[in-house]
UniProtKB/Swiss-Prot annotation:
One of its GO terms (biological process) is translation. Part of the 30S ribosomal subunit. Forms a loose heterodimer with protein S19. Forms two bridges to the 50S subunit in the 70S ribosome. Pfam families: Ribosomal_S13. This is Small ribosomal subunit protein uS13. Located at the top of the head of the 30S subunit, it contacts several helices of the 16S rRNA. In the 70S ribosome it contacts the 23S rRNA (bridge B1a) and protein L5 of the 50S subunit (bridge B1b), connecting the 2 subunits; these bridges are implicated in subunit movement. Contacts the tRNAs in the A and P-sites. The gene is rpsM.
Amino acid sequence: MARILGVDLPRNKRVEIALTYIYGIGRPRAAMICKQVGIPSELRTEGLTDEHIAKIRSIVEANFKVEGDLRREIGQSIKRLMDLNCFRGIRHRKGLPVRGQNTRSNARTRKGPKKTVANKKKAV
């Protein structure tokens, strides 16, 4: 099993798909990496040589911010927005959508499950 940047790549998947298991590498970047290394698109991870793995590792480390570094940078940028008390930071703090989406009827993913409120009792 190939291990790149602390991530075990699945053996039976194509290299292009297996690289997407690394946080910060999607399909386009994975295709670009495979092209730079010279790996055919149909090659599976189990068919990689140590030389291929070393080349992939060097390309990823040199050109991309991935895994812990990327997660840390994203977290710090969100924390910076929250410290600035700007609109986006306030939305992050309240757990609401940040990019202007409607919250009257949707946004359940961001807001979490419904919190039901009891009805008021009528006076007799």
